[in-house]
């Protein structure tokens, strides 16, 4: 019973705190630009509004258009549950869980790109092609980072890998993971998720035809992914040890 409660608590932490990080980022960006900016809790308001709205479907859309965001959200949530939360450890930990984490992130990306192509829109197909092109580089970088941590710690378990020091290569590891964080979360300089400029859109263009709950799943999944990479970056560079239980 305690394990179930612990799992539910960790799940609630990830799901409830994830939309807060994009709000903080947008607030800081607005402050730097000299603007007031949206409220920190704006994404919570948007998600609540989208869950109450209906879904507008293209006549060319298949069931994969609806299933894609749902499967991607489940995959990202599962990946988050594998990620240790500081010294408290992770909800699901086993030997080789880091490999499952990489596969779940790839599955989420595949489902998002698949759903984009199911609309029959050349515009979203272009975005899916751009996403896959960047994924080739990002996945190679994250695999290299995982391999370096595995060699350094002698383990392929996330809890062990992130509870020990990264050694002399911590700076290079941090630079690599930070680059992956930017590429995976619409934060590269020419991919602004707040704009709709055709020449620069990568991630945002894939979800232009989504609405209602599927769009809410996409936005919430993106916030979970951003928080996951932020936690991974911090713990890879600043290991916090491990406690037996919460």
What role is predicted for each listed range?
Residues 1-246:
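Alpha-helical transmembrane segments of multi-pass membrane proteins predominantly involved
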């Amino acid at each position: 019973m305690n394990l179930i409660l612990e799992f539910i608590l960790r799940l609630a932490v990830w799901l409830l705190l994830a939309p807060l990080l994009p709000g903080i980022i947008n607030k800081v960006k607005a402050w730097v630009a000299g603007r007031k900016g949206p409220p920190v809790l704006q994404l919570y308001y948007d998600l609540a509004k989208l869950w109450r709205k209906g879904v507008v479907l293209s006549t060319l859309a298949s069931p994969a258009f609806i299933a894609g965001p749902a499967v991607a959200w489940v995959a990202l949530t599962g990946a988050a549950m594998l990620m240790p939360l500081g010294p408290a450890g992770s909800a699901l930990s086993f030997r080789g869980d880091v490999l499952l984490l990489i596969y779940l992130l790839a599955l989420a990306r595949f489902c998002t790109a698949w759903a984009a192509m199911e609309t029959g829109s050349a515009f979203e197909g272009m975005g899916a092609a751009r996403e896959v092109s960047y994924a080739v580089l990002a996945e190679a970088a994250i695999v290299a980072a995982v391999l370096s941590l595995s060699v350094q710690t002698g383990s392929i378990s996330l809890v062990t890998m992130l509870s020990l020091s990264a050694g002399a290569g911590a700076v290079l590891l941090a630079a690599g993971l930070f680059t992956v964080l930017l590429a995976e979360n619409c934060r590269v300089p020419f991919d602004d998720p707040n704009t709709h400029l055709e020449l620069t859109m990568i991630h945002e263009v894939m979800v232009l035809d989504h609405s209602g709950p599927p769009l809410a799943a996409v936005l919430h999944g993106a916030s979970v992914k951003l928080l996951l990479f932020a936690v991974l970056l911090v713990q890879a560079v600043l290991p916090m040890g491990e406690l037996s239980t919460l």
